[in-house]
């Protein structure tokens, strides 16, 4: 019997998707513009009704950077679904949805600090679940090196939303000030998406 779910799987397998590069500059500009004052075109998932707005905000940044929404297959990411607005659901999405010519959606991978660049994401996973997501908007360096300050950075600057509009909205904030341990930090390299 053909169901809507089966039809989505068939369509996903039969379709060849084209790669679209991530516009890091556009994503970063969006993050910096809306870090302190949320975009009124989207709901704010803060106190007292929700646990936080971090992943809703980083999803908006990805979308502003040209990442296409994905409503095909088991793992999906589109405006205001659970993966769009929830840190752990977003982790499950990008970690399981391996964007490729036959899989629609985000192409992202785990990375290491030295390879993180503008508009990549960083997630906090203290135990069994991701609890927070931020976007990289800058760097701190001791030396400029070989025309690649990202390579010689000792810290990155981040933008974030949280559950509290007064204290949780950060713009160009040093990641080191958050004091996350190495074990609980996941660096997410964003390559682009397949559409």
Language-model-derived ranges and their functions:
Residues 152-165, 170-195:
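Low-complexity, Gly/Ser/Thr/Pro-rich intrinsically disordered linker/tail segments
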Residues 3-83:
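N-terminal capping segments
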Residues 78-158:
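...with weaker cross-activation on analogous glycine-rich loops/strands in unrelated enzymes
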Residues 1-3, 176-177:
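Low-complexity, intrinsically disordered terminal/linker segments enriched in charged
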Residues 70-74, 136-137, 171-172:
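Short, solvent-exposed loop/turn and secondary-structure capping segments
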Residues 40, 46-51, 140-154, 172-181:
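Intrinsically disordered, low-complexity coil segments
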Residues 64, 68, 140, 164:
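Short loop/turn segments at secondary-structure transitions that flank enzyme active sites
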Residues 55-64, 133-137, 157-160:
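Active-site scaffold segments
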């Amino acid at each position: 019997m053909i169901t809507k779910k089966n039809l989505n799987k068939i369509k996903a397998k039969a379709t060849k998707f084209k790669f679209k590069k991530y516009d890091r500059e556009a994503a970063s500009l969006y993050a910096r513009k809306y870090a302190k004052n949320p975009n009124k075109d989207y709901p704010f998932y803060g106190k007292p009704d929700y646990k936080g707005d971090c992943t809703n905000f980083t999803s908006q940044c990805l979308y502003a950077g040209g990442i296409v929404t994905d409503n095909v297959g088991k793992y999906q990411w589109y405006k205001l679904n659970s993966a769009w607005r929830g840190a752990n659901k977003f982790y499950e999405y990008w970690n399981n949805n391996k964007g490729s010519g036959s899989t629609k959606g985000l192409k992202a991978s785990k990375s290491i600090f030295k390879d993180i660049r503008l508009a990549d994401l960083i997630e906090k996973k203290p135990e069994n679940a991701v609890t927070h997501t931020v976007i990289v908007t800058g760097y701190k360096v001791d030396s400029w090196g070989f025309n690649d300050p990202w390579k010689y950075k000792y810290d990155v600057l981040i933008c974030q939303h949280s559950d509290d509009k007064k204290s949780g909205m950060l713009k160009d904030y040093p990641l080191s000030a958050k004091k996350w341990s190495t074990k609980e930090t996941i660096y997410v390299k964003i390559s682009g998406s397949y559409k």
